[in-house]
Curated annotation (Swiss-Prot):
It comes from Xanthomonas euvesicatoria pv. vesicatoria (strain 85-10). InterPro entries: ACT-like_dom_sf (IPR045865), ACT_dom (IPR002912), HD/PDEase_dom (IPR003607), HD_domain (IPR006674), NT_sf (IPR043519), PII_UdlTrfase/GS_AdlTrfase (IPR013546), Polymerase_NTP_transf_dom (IPR002934), UTase/UR (IPR010043). This is Bifunctional uridylyltransferase/uridylyl-removing enzyme. Uridylyltransferase (UTase) activity is inhibited by glutamine, while glutamine activates uridylyl-removing (UR) activity. Keywords: Hydrolase, Magnesium, Multifunctional enzyme, Nucleotidyltransferase, Repeat, Transferase. Residues 333-691 are annotated as: Uridylyl-removing. Residues 1-332 are annotated as: Uridylyltransferase.
């Protein structure tokens, strides 16, 4: 930008617009040249320095245009700009330094300067302060952080010295206090992101393991040791050469991501949002292949970089702390280990002296002492250096395998596995685990990387083992004590997704890996078969519960036959609960808990009674009626009343609901006469948001659609709907719902009152609400798929609908069914991230299955309603 027009003599304020008009395209062209060099692979360190240099020249020329040479003011770059780094859309932070008299005298000139820079297109963030004001402002460590990296743009030696003196440690923030403040800031920032970088849309600047972590280490080093980069600490013995090299390499990786993100977003975006991930991956050269999408490769690279940065920065933070506090007297633990200021440390400086078995001894000591704060930085570094010598399990000797299994059988096995994963040991011991470390799946269903999901599953298993009830898992704490060998469940959890990303069925491929691992670690044939079977079938219970009708005895019989034994059922149930709950914080809810518990109890009963002769339908009806009768009698109802209510309920009702649900429905019917409408709602689980809505009404056109639309408008998501024909031309509708929007208050009485009011009016006036599709869902659109099959022995038609999920989807589907004059008998709603997979059993208005022409008309109507194109 040597040809900037600002170098001409100042023609006065009137010429500022012309100057800005000429300078603006020069800045744009400079950025375009940098973008081209970025695409050619030039190091980011050089690109951000070149951009800062270009802006430097423009800033100086604008300053000379607006500010008199004898003003007594000086101009300084601060923050990232002060470091000499400017990303494409970053703010340009500057400080104008001068005494208060000079500030006041040139106030209009400064306003002109900043306006001119904005007109050019620079996002200026400025402060005007005297040295004393800098000292006062630096009481806020975030201000000090910006100032300690200041760089003079237009300033003489006196101005530079005045600023340095104003923020020197004798004035503000002694090094130790600054270190503590920045460490607390770092920890608080990590907490804002859930203490993990493994989010679907991570923040590459401020998130854990991001660029801000590296900058924080640099600020600490600058304040404490007076060095401008971490590499300078190598000579001082505070940072290892390998650590400095690794941090420099990962900084380049993250900086390239950030530079590219600013380009594709055309704004100062720091989050890798779905809006930009694919475009950025393509720009960075990550191509799709049969096993992985390019965007998945890019994200895996990021997650691995963030994990390594966190690992090394943890060590450096501890070393910086030791510089201020000194080393405490070691507290011997035995076995060659001690506690140093609460950290576990190897006694020998040369640990582990070539003995890789010491790695397992280290984790055994860690597990044995709950008071340990973490791993001592020197021992952590020694561990990192010895990792390359740790053999994978398949080539390790029997003693090493025994040591690993001893850790797995220990009382704190899940904590140990988490630590081993975080420090890279687990991936070294099981190379397949290293392959999925940092691996994301480009969808909204899996909100964690594969390795983090696996660790979440293991943590959930640890909750089952805690021996106390958890309201999220109603029966898991009862099933857990039945496990013969809990470590087998941990192994199944460890291997269940380990084959993700290889192509093919990950359950089958993972089962092969699990078998090989079990055999290598000398598990018995029975234990090996159990772990292998669990990995291969780990999705079966979830799919059965969510996609099939578990009130159907044939479904239960098929599932129980597949499971075969009570032991397998116990293990599979716990693995399924842990897996679903570890997939997404929002995925597990009271309805899924109840659904899996119902399937568990139904399968357990089938196994107990024998699979050869399942109980006939009449016997099941009789048992359900008697169980419900017993509950109603306990509530004070006589047999005459009970029989009268049972007579008004469809037989199928007794096969689909639990006895306590039947008793609630029957007791509710006492309040209503034939031909009247009843709406009841209750909490399905005490102290939980899950609601059960029961509607008894004369059959009316549009009833189902009106109920669904009302529930949707009130912010409730429907998880299951049962629609049964009752005597006297009435219908039984039972909806299982959860608050889905913030405006759904979760009050069952208010919801029931709203539904009563709607059903008392004209149902044809009730229309689905129109709502915008959330930003994240817009990036996962696909054409809906509609399939038909027969159900109920050919008396009904089953629709299987797979479509992009969005607010109000079910209400729109119900409206289409109503406009096609179709009757809904059953609805099963399942959402998997961005995919809605719903099933309906329907008939035409004459209660007949759909003809081929009716099917085609319905398919066309649904696709027209749901197709995103």
């Amino acid at each position: 930008m040597t040809d900037t027009p600002a170098e001409r003599p100042d023609p006065g304020v009137a010429g500022d617009a012309d100057w800005a008009a000429q300078a603006r395209p020069l800045l744009v062209h400079a950025d375009m040249r940098l973008c081209k060099r970025f695409d050619q692979g030039e190091p980011i360190e050089r690109l951000v320095a070149l951009r800062a240099r270009a802006v430097d020249q423009l800033m100086r020329n604008a300053w000379m245009r607006c500010i008199p040479a004898d003003s007594g003011l000086s101009l300084h770059a601060v923050g990232g700009y002060g470091r000499g780094e400017l990303f494409p859309r970053s703010d340009v932070d500057v400080l104008v330094l001068g005494d208060t008299a000079a500030q006041q005298q040139h106030e209009q000139a400064l306003a002109r300067l900043f306006a001119l820079l904005w007109d050019v297109g620079l996002p200026i963030s400025h402060a005007v302060r005297s040295p004393a004001q800098c000292t006062a402002a630096a009481a806020d460590q975030t201000v000090l952080t910006a100032l300690i990296e200041s760089r003079a743009l237009v300033a003489d030696g006196q101005a530079r010295a005045a600023l340095a003196t104003a923020i020197a440690p004798p004035q503000v923030w002694p090094p130790r206090d600054f270190f503590q403040a920045k460490r607390e800031e770092l920890l608080a920032r990590h907490q804002r992101f859930g203490d993990t970088a493994d989010n679907l849309e991570p923040d590459i600047k401020d998130g854990p393991g991001g660029l801000r972590d590296l900058q924080t280490l640099g600020w600490m080093a600058l304040r404490a040791f007076g060095v401008k980069d971490l590499e300078a600490l190598v000579g001082l013995g505070h940072v290892g050469f390998d650590e400095a090299a690794a941090l420099r390499r990962e900084r380049e990786e993250l900086a390239r991501l950030r530079f590219g993100l600013h380009i594709v977003a055309n704004r100062p975006e720091e989050r890798l949002r779905f809006d930009y991930q694919k475009t950025l991956a393509e720009r960075l050269g990550f191509a799709d292949d049969p096993e992985s999408l390019g965007v998945e490769k890019m994200m895996q690279r990021f997650y691995r970089s963030a994990a390594l940065i966190r690992r090394i920065s943890d060590r450096l933070l501890q070393r910086f702390e030791e510089q201020f506090d000194g080393e405490a007297t070691p507290e011997p633990l035995g076995g060659g280990f001690s506690l140093r200021r609460g950290y576990l440390a190897a006694d020998a400086e040369s640990w582990p002296d070539g003995d890789v078995l010491q790695v397992f001894a280290l984790f055994a000591q860690w597990a044995a002492h709950r008071e340990v704060r973490g791993l001592h930085s020197l021992t952590a570094r020694a561990l990192a250096e010895v990792l390359r010598d740790l053999p994978a399990y398949d080539i390790a000797d029997a003693t090493a395998r025994e040591r690993f299994m001893a850790l797995l059988r220990g009382p704190r096995a899940v904590e140990t596995l988490n630590r081993m994963a975080r420090l890279g040991v687990l991936g070294q011991w099981i190379p397949a685990f290293a392959s999925v470390s940092g691996r994301m799946q480009f969808d909204l269903f899996h909100v964690y990387t594969v390795d983090q999901h696996t660790l979440m599953v293991l943590r959930n298993i640890a909750l089952f083992a805690a021996g106390r009830a958890d309201e999220r898992f109603s029966i898991a704490h009862e099933v857990w004590p039945r496990l013969r060998k809990p470590e087998l469940l941990l192994l199944a959890g460890l291997f269940h997704d380990i084959a993700k990303g290889r192509g093919g069925d990950h359950s089958e491929l993972g089962a092969v890996d699990a078998r090989a691992f079990c055999l290598a670690h000398r598990l018995s044939e029975g234990d090996t078969e159990l772990v292998t079977w669990l990995v291969e079938q780990h999705l079966r219970m979830s799919v059965t519960a969510q996609k099939q009708d578990i009130s159907d005895p044939e479904v239960i019989h098929r599932f129980a036959t597949l499971v075969g034994t009570r032991e397998r059922l116990d293990y599979l149930y716990l693995l399924t609960c842990a897996d679903i709950a570890g997939t997404s914080p929002k995925l597990w809810n009271a309805w899924k808990d109840r659904l899996l518990a119902d399937l568990y109890f139904a399968a357990r009963r089938a196994l107990r009674e024998g699979l050869e002769h399942p109980p006939p339908r009449e016997e099941r009806l009789r048992e359900a009626r008697e169980s419900a009768r017993t509950l109603m009698q306990a509530q004070g109802h006589d047999d005459v009343t009970i029989d009268r209510q049972f007579a008004g309920m469809p037989d199928e009702n007794f096969l689909r609901f639990r006895p306590e649900q039947l008793a609630w429905q029957a007791a509710s019917l006492i309040e209503v006469e034939i031909g009247q409408t009843l709406v009841k709602a209750r909490r399905a689980v005490p102290d939980n948001d899950a609601l059960e809505v029961f509607v008894y009404s004369p059959d009316r056109d549009g009833l189902f659609a009106a109920i669904v639309a009302t529930l949707d408008r009130k912010g409730y998501g429907i998880h299951r709907a049962r629609v049964l024909d009752a005597p006297h031309d009435a219908i039984f509708d039972v909806f299982e719902v959860l608050p889905q929007e913030t405006y759904a208050d979760g009050d069952p009485q208010r919801l029931a009152a709203t539904l009563r009011q709607v059903l008392a009016g004209d149902l044809h006036k009730v229309r689905p609400a129109r709502r915008a599709v959330p930003r994240q869902l817009r990036h996962f659109r696909f054409a809906p798929r509609v399939e038909f099959s027969e159900s109920a022995g050919g008396r009904r038609t089953r629709i299987s609908l797979v479509a992009p999920d969005r607010p109000g989807l079910l209400a729109d589907v119900a409206h289409v069914l109503r406009m096609q004059h179709l009757r809904v008998h059953d609805a099963r709603i399942a959402t998997f991230g961005e995919r809605a997979e719903d099933q309906f059993q329907i008939t035409d208005e004459h209660d007949r299955p759909l003809s081929e022409s009716a099917r085609q008309a319905l398919r066309d109507a649904l696709c027209a309603c749901l197709d995103p194109v």
